[in-house]
Design a protein with these regions (language model features):
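A broad, structure-centric signal for solvent-exposed, well-ordered loop/edge residues
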Residues: 8, 42-43, 48, 83-86, ...
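Structural recognition of the beta-strand scaffold that forms the well-ordered cores
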Residues: 1, 33-35, 57-61
Length: 93
């Protein structure tokens, strides 16, 4: 998983590692996810393209970074009155 933040960056930078650990645990180790911080494989703002092109299998970032690729991503990037994190997770499922 490539991310848009440095590894261990407080808050959002540690979330990717927590997600990876949760998936590893939930799959009993069948799925092993290694987290790469911004710049380790691709620059921060190239995470979306890296996943789309197959350079990385997963990406973790803020959808607002990629509004130019799809304006609909703005709805998931923090618009006031938009979905809460819980609502967004429920919608995605």
């Amino acid at each position: 998983m490539v991310t848009t933040w440095p590894k261990n960056f407080p808050g959002v930078g540690t979330t990717a590692e927590k997600i990876a650990q949760s998936i590893n645990k939930a799959s009993d180790g069948r799925l092993e996810i290694k987290v790469y911080g911004a710049g380790e494989i691709v620059p921060a703002y190239e995470v979306f393209d890296a996943v789309r092109q197959g350079t990385a299998e997963m990406g973790h970032g803020w959808s607002g970074y990629w509004i130019s690729k799809n304006p609909g991503l703005a709805y998931f990037g923090g618009i006031p009155g938009g979905l809460s994190p819980s609502e967004q997770s429920a919608w995605a499922l």
